[in-house]
Amino acid sequence: DCPPDWSSYEGHCYRFFKEWMHWDDAEEFCTEQQTGAHLVSFQSKEEADFVRSLTSEMLKGDVVWIGLSDVWNKCRFEWTDGMEFDYDDYYLIAEYECVASKPTNNKWWIIPCTRFKNFVCEFQA
């Protein structure tokens, strides 16, 4: 079961935070919310679609931080929860390190980590 204000999908809990933070501050914020929580990681298109359903109406076309970056390991993107990045729909090459998702169309954007964005946290229930 997920705590109040969190949504459940496939054994994980998700929550959209309409607060503006840099990527690293958002990741730290997520880890403080629940044991094992991180910025959201996507392991399937269906999971990404579920998160999109939580956020798209509130964002009106903006992007949200997700837990994918190459902040710690240049040239190799990794999820903050330790899951391997093997999401077939995306191939990432960019000059920036942090990834945001645009929920209205599930497109991913690689942008500077210092931008202020809303975000989604996730943890295993």
Curated annotation (Swiss-Prot):
Domain C-type lectin: start-end pairs: 9-122
Classification via InterPro entries: C-type_lectin-like, C-type_lectin-like/link_sf, C-type_lectin/snaclec_domain, CTDL_fold
Record bears the keyword Secreted: yes
Biotech utility: Is a standard reagent for testing vWF/platelet interactions and detection of the defects in von Willebrand disease and in GPIb-related disorders such as Bernard-Soulier syndrome.
SS bonds (residue pairs): 2-13, 30-121, 98-113
Expression sites (tissue/organ): Expressed by the venom gland.
GO molecular function, one term: toxin activity
Location of this chain's protein in the cell: Secreted
GO cellular component entries: extracellular region
Alphabetic keyword roster: Disulfide bond, Hemostasis impairing toxin, Platelet aggregation activating toxin, Secreted, Toxin
SUPFAM superfamilies given in the database record: C-type lectin-like
Other notes: There are two distinct forms of the vWF-dependent platelet coagglutinin. The dimeric form (snaclec) is 34-fold more active than the metalloprotease botrocetin in promoting vWF binding to platelets.
Function: Snaclec that binds to von Willebrand factor (VWF) and induces its interaction with GPIbalpha (GP1BA) (via the vWF A1 domain), resulting in platelet aggregation.
Subunit field text: Heterodimer of subunits alpha and beta; disulfide-linked. Botrocetin and vWF form a soluble complex.
Family, per entry: Belongs to the snaclec family.
Protein name: Snaclec botrocetin subunit beta
Organism, as annotated: Bothrops jararaca (Jararaca)
Lineage: Eukaryota, Metazoa, Chordata, Craniata, Vertebrata
